[in-house]
A protein has these predicted regions:
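Loop-helix junctions at membrane interfaces
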Residues: 1-178
């Protein structure tokens, strides 16, 4: 049985709350979630601040919790997002903590892996629903429509993660950004 330290449990709780509040603010302001990707930020932060299991769980739990709170992401899309966000949390944590990549390369690698999972998930979902699967529109949604969210992630996540991690380490132990 794995026991979470108080710090990790507190961080996971704050990130879960942030993962509910940010999408709610987007929806209230009329900004589509697929443009700013508000659930992604807490999951990526979790990848750098929590263990791989906790950050994976955070990514898997956020979409259905948000669906229950706000109805978004819509059913059955949240199933695909559970896989995508789970991989974001798991991959960013493994790249950063196990492979010792810097924050930005870990974030970028996790973004690519998560989007690959999303593409696979949507192809399976469309096959189950008997819909035509248009790869180009999905790629446009994952990479073009969401460019503002990707830009926000590439700026905000490394800065916030480095700031939080820096406060825990000695002066000589600053986390690598690159």
């Amino acid at each position: 049985m794995v026991l979470l330290r108080t710090r990790d449990l507190t961080r996971a709780s704050v990130l879960l709350a942030l993962g509910i509040v940010l999408p709610s603010l987007c929806h209230l302001s009329g900004i589509p979630g697929q443009v700013f990707l508000p659930m992604h930020i807490p999951v990526f932060l979790g990848g750098f601040l929590l263990g791989s299991g906790e950050s994976f769980l955070l990514g898997v739990v956020l979409p259905p919790v948000n669906f229950l709170v706000s109805g978004m992401p819509p059913f059955p899309n949240f199933f695909v997002m559970m896989g995508e966000l789970g991989v974001y949390g798991l991959a960013s944590s493994l790249f950063f903590r196990r492979l010792r990549w810097g924050i930005v390369p870990s974030l970028f690698g996790a973004m690519l892996l998560g989007r690959a999972v999303a593409i696979s998930g949507y192809s399976v979902l469309f096959a189950i629903l008997g819909r035509d699967f248009n790869v180009l529109s999905l790629l446009q949604s994952l990479f073009v429509v969401s460019l503002p969210g990707i830009a926000i992630q590439l700026v905000a996540v490394p800065g916030l993660a480095a700031l939080i991690l820096r406060r825990e380490r000695d002066v000589a132990g600053y986390p690598r950004l690159l």
